[in-house]
Amino acid sequence: MIVMLSEKGEDMLSIARRTAAGAAILLIMPLAVWVSGWMWQPGQNATWLKTLYWITETVTQPWGIITHVILCAWFLWCLRFRLRAALMLFAILGGAILIGQGVKSWVKDHVQEPRPFVVWLEKAHHVPVDEFYNLKRKDRGALVKEQLAEQQDIPKFLRKHWQKETGFAFPSGHTMFAASWALLGVGLLWPRRRTVTIAILLVWATGVMGSRLLLGMHWPRDLVVATLISWLLVTLATWLAERICGPLTPPPVEEEEIAERDQSDA
């Protein structure tokens, strides 16, 4: 059933179509990798891995909190709601991200899929996956450190990253964070024609997703399912934002700014 809003608002179906288009863009890379049959193996170029590591760190605590605050502030500026509506939007944005992370944790605990680097540890260092995950998190990190102490083909920063990230793989929490923000951009900012912001968010989210694959943290299916969950949550969050905070379409004054921006871009 389509939930209709005020005359100035969009219905749920229109919002879902828009965010689905964004989700489809994000799914291109992981689906292509999945279909290709690519499997992660250690030994990639250290400089390239370091770049990917810093991309993934934009989502990892504490940097992820800073990213969240910056994006919230930018969205509030772009939408230019009044104070009460802005505070409500801030709560909706934060709620969408937190609920997504909660869903991720629940699914991880029930599916219990091992990370690619843990599967590799079993093959290369004879560390059984079941025994690894039966350990407490602190002990898992210590085991990774011990087993890879002499593994010079794996950069030190990546070994430390693995020591911290010893949880289950499915779905990808980093992907859910980045994909949620990218899709919130599509859902909330497209009516304001913030195309540059949307493009940057989509590229950034795809970069985060790729980094999770190449750092040995996730399988392609982890990224696909995380993106689909994000799409569902963001579609609802966008609909709530318009219903509670007001129409996403710009007022007449801002329409003039958009027209001027479009002319300068052309």
Give residue spans per PLM region:
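Hydrophobic alpha-helical bundle signature of multipass membrane enzymes
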Residues: 2-167, 180-189, 195, 199
